[in-house]
């Protein structure tokens, strides 16, 4: 199982490096923004195509990294009684990879929203520039300010939703971590009872004594109830 763990760990690091590269490419779309009003519509369309391609690739890599982390959790949880899996460094590694995944998710959503907002603004400005060249429809360009404000409002709502999703993912990770700890405790107890038969026998005796005490108590209560009923009737 240690070989499987090492293979998953290497795969996780490789996927994390790929996400790093893609995030840099995504942020470059914001850095290369013209920022002015003289924007060509074809250029904006090309940047939007690149944006969709990069975001799709990053989402696929994040999903892949999530699956790898789940596999690592399963391997460590199933072998928690083994010497290598009980090493605190293993739990630290699991926790570190989950934190990296969460940070990548937050960074991706932030960069995606920023780039999408910039591209939407550039698209509106490029459309406005094309229409403003025609005097007959020049007055239509005034409405784009309203569209830009509405777009900012929608992006703000998206950011709030992303924050809620991030909180839900954090809760899920905490629950999964607690489940792994509980499975580890259960496996260790099972291992101890097998390794030390005396402890297992003692636990069985305690369980048997509890059952006997319960039966005696039930008999005493039943006798008292029967005696009370006869006393009331008589």
Curated annotation (Swiss-Prot):
GO molecular function terms noted in the UniProt entry: SNAP receptor activity
Signal peptide (from-to): none
Membrane spanning residue stretches: 213-233
Swiss-Prot/TrEMBL keywords: Coiled coil, ER-Golgi transport, Golgi apparatus, Membrane, Protein transport, Receptor, Transmembrane, Transmembrane helix, Transport
Membrane topology, as annotated: Single-pass type IV membrane protein
A Pfam family per the record: V-SNARE_C
InterPro entries in the cross-refs: Golgi_SNAP_su1
Cytoplasmic side of membrane: 1-212
GO cellular component, one term: Golgi medial cisterna
GO terms for biological process, alphabetical: endoplasmic reticulum to Golgi vesicle-mediated transport; inter-Golgi cisterna vesicle-mediated transport; protein transport; vesicle fusion
Localization in the cell: Golgi apparatus membrane
Residue intervals on the Vesicular side: 234
Coiled coil regions in record: 54-121
Quaternary organization: Component of several multiprotein Golgi SNARE complexes.
Function summary: Involved in transport from the ER to the Golgi apparatus as well as in intra-Golgi transport. It belongs to a super-family of proteins called t-SNAREs or soluble NSF (N-ethylmaleimide-sensitive factor) attachment protein receptor. Cooperates with ykt-6 for proper expression of Golgi-resident proteins. Required along with ykt-6 for normal embryonic development, seam cell division or differentiation, and ray formation.
Sequence similarity: Belongs to the GOSR1 family.
PANTHER family registered for this protein in UniProt: GOLGI SNAP RECEPTOR COMPLEX MEMBER 1 (PTHR21094:SF2), GOS-28 SNARE- RELATED (PTHR21094)
Stated name of the protein: Golgi SNAP receptor complex member 1
Species of origin: Caenorhabditis briggsae
Gene that specifies this protein: gos-28
